[in-house]
From Swiss-Prot:
Protein name per its UniProtKB record: Putative uncharacterized transmembrane protein C1235.17
Lineage: Eukaryota, Fungi, Dikarya, Ascomycota, Taphrinomycotina
Highest taxon above the source species: Eukaryota
Keywords, alphabetical: Membrane, Transmembrane, Transmembrane helix
Record's subcellular location: Membrane
Topology versus the membrane: Multi-pass membrane protein
TM region(s), chain numbering: 50-70, 80-100, 127-147
One GO term describing the cellular component: membrane
Length: 150
């Protein structure tokens, strides 16, 4: 129990630290890089670039979290002498999850773009879109953590 408990705590802590730093970076980048044209209106193209950067960063963070999880699990497997079959199943599980995340990212990016085309004419509405994305992100990150705990 001790080793398994430590293994879970390491994964959760690593995921939390990486995600927290990512959110700070994304928010800073969003507010600093919110481009404006000469008339003082927000430039939609620069906004979409920022959204794209946020989505890309989120993908890399998830990939990094998976790598951290894989490394800690590898050490866990070596210390507990878990069979090759179990290890192979775990690798396949990670590959499937990364494949699914890719399609989830594309789907929600298309939703954001479609949503922004109608609503991104003011900064207040942009805040709503970004807030929606981060709420979605943390909600599914929480579900992902709960699923891993089972």
């Amino acid at each position: 129990m001790g080793r398994c408990g430590t293994h879970t705590q390491i994964n959760f802590l690593a995921g939390f630290v990486v995600r927290f730093n990512n959110v700070k970076t994304c928010l800073a980048q969003f507010w600093v890089n919110m481009g404006q044209n000469k008339e003082g209106n927000a430039d939609k193209s620069s906004y979409f670039k920022v959204v794209s950067v946020i989505l890309t960063l989120r993908g890399y963070v998830q990939l990094g979290y998976m790598v951290i999880h894989l490394v800690t699990h590898t050490l866990h497997c070596i210390t507990l002498y878990i069979t090759i079959t179990h290890y192979t199943i775990y690798i396949v599980n990670i590959v499937i999850q990364l494949w699914l995340y890719r399609y989830i990212e594309r789907f929600f990016y298309s939703l954001l773009v479609e949503y922004c085309e109608n609503l991104c004419d003011s900064k207040e509405k942009r805040k709503v879109v970004i807030r929606f994305y981060f709420h979605f992100y943390f909600f599914f990150s929480f579900l992902f953590f709960i699923e891993k705990k089972k």
